[in-house]
Regions:
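N-terminal signal-anchor/start-transfer transmembrane helix
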Residues: 1-24
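Hydrophobic H-region at the start of alpha-helical membrane spans
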Residues: 2-5, 31-32, 122-129
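Transmembrane alpha-helical segments of multi-pass membrane proteins
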Residues: 27-41, 62-75, 114-123
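Membrane-helix interface motif
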Residues: 41-58, 86-95, 140-142
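Short alpha-helical packing/oligomerization segments
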Residues: 58-100
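Juxtamembrane inter-helical linkers in multi-pass membrane proteins
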Residues: 93-113
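Loop-to-transmembrane boundary segments
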Residues: 107-133
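Juxtamembrane boundary at the C-terminal end of a transmembrane helix
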Residues: 130-142
Length: 142
């Protein structure tokens, strides 16, 4: 239960920190963090396996579960942020397209998007946050 809440709060903080548009450098670091999670899960698994062999405090099946759950939880945190950032990136790409190729309607779309986009972003973050509760419940408590 404690680990479930820790990952849930980490996910909420990471989703709601306000950094929803990434630069090229941030995208590169974000992609490297996915690779880092995979490598970290493998290292954690080997470390846990060696710990069980030297000092048998948990069973092998529990060690396998912990390795899977920790890796899946970190991947889920990154995937939730990826969803939000991709929605913002797609929307800004649509607006750039309209500014360049649909300039006669861009002003109307721009004023409309300035009115609705903050509330739609909050709605998207709420939906993704509710989905993350279900994901972490499935990983840690089910």
């Amino acid at each position: 239960m404690d680990v479930f809440l820790i990952f849930l709060f980490v996910n909420f903080y990471y989703l709601w920190n306000g950094k929803d548009n990434f630069s090229k450098k941030t995208w590169l670091l974000f992609g490297l963090s996915f690779i880092g999670v995979i490598v970290g899960a493998i290292i954690f698994g080997f470390a846990l396996k060696n710990l069980v062999l030297v000092w048998p405090v948990i069973t092998i099946s529990t060690a396998k579960f912990l390795t899977m759950a920790v890796g899946a939880s970190f991947t889920a945190v990154l995937a939730m942020k990826f969803l939000i950032v991709m929605l913002c990136t797609m929307f800004s790409g649509f607006m750039r397209f309209h500014k360049k190729y649909n300039s006669e309607n861009y002003q109307a779309l721009s004023s409309l998007s300035k009115g609705f986009s903050p509330s739609l972003l909050i709605l998207a973050k709420c939906v993704v946050s509710c989905g993350s509760v279900l994901i972490f419940y499935g990983i840690w408590l089910a």
